[in-house]
Amino acid sequence: MARLNPNRRTRGLAILETALILPLLFVLVMGVIEYGWLFFKNQQVSAAARTACRFGITAPATTAETLAMCDTLMTKANLGSSGYTKTSTPCEVLAGTSVTVTITVPYSNIKLTGFPLPLPTNLVGTTTMAKEGPP
């Protein structure tokens, strides 16, 4: 009777376990990377909206200058070609009146991995601040 080598059997089992677990590990790693990218880009969009709104509430700023500041900030964040939209309430208002800047970026245009995960369709950064200046 031939004796079976126990090492050979264990080696085959390890390959089988690796083949079953490796795809799950790959999906987990890709999900972590994609969600990290999502949070990073969402922070950039929110920061751009906040900075543009801060610019818009200063006394001599106009709505057109505020929207141009959005373009500058989005280009600096490497989101200039992402197909984003920007809106601003009029900046030529009295002191104390609120000014709102909103930037919306379609997430499908800035995906990192393209891996099919449940992700939001848009990243939205909205900031509202009161207009500065003498009352």
Locate predicted features:
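N-terminal leader/signal peptides at the extreme start of proteins
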Residues: M1-R11
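Short, conserved structural patches
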Residues: A2-R3, N42, R50-P135
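Catalytic tyrosine of NAD(P)H-dependent dehydrogenase/reductases that use a Tyr as the general acid/base
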Residues: L13, M30, L38
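Membrane-proximal amphipathic alpha-helices
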Residues: E34-V45, A59
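Small-residue faces within membrane-embedded alpha-helices
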Residues: I21-P23, V27, G31, A52
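N-terminal signal-anchor/signal peptide hydrophobic helix marking the start
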Residues: R11-L24, Y35
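Alpha-helical membrane and juxtamembrane elements of multi-pass inner-membrane transport
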Residues: T10-A14, F26, A64-L67, T121
